Amino acid sequence: MNSKVNDIICTVSNLFHSKGYENTKLSEILAETGIGKGQFYHYFKSKRELGEAVIDHLIAEMTEELFVGILDQSLPPKVKLQKMLDTVLTLQMEHEGKRGCPIGNLAIELSEHDPLFREKLAHFFEQWEKKVQLMLDE
């Protein structure tokens, strides 16, 4: 993925986190990213395709931070649990607890309306649940 596409995805990820997917208009995406409509459609076929890229980005980010960075480490279960909770709390405190979880918000907003989004988001939460269960079984 080129850096411009990555920049767009990161910027829109913040927009979706603060406003939601449905409430974010294409005009806002264009204004925040500083690209024109033609450039947007060069990179993405639709807002939905961008939404999928944002979900993939958020899942990859959280997978790296929570799974690889904490739950897959050779640490005592109590330390893993504390690190995981600290990570989630830090994420919440970045926005004074006002925005919620970026992935959780998208899951609540989109799961009933889009099967692909629902599948991707559900898979992430299932993997997280399995990792926590394995940790608790240690």
Language model regions located:
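Hydrophobic alpha-helical bundle segments that form small-molecule/ligand-binding pockets
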Residues: 113-115, 125-138
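Amphipathic alpha-helical segments used for helix-helix packing
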Residues: 95-116
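Hydrophobic alpha-helical connector segments
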Residues: 53, 68-98
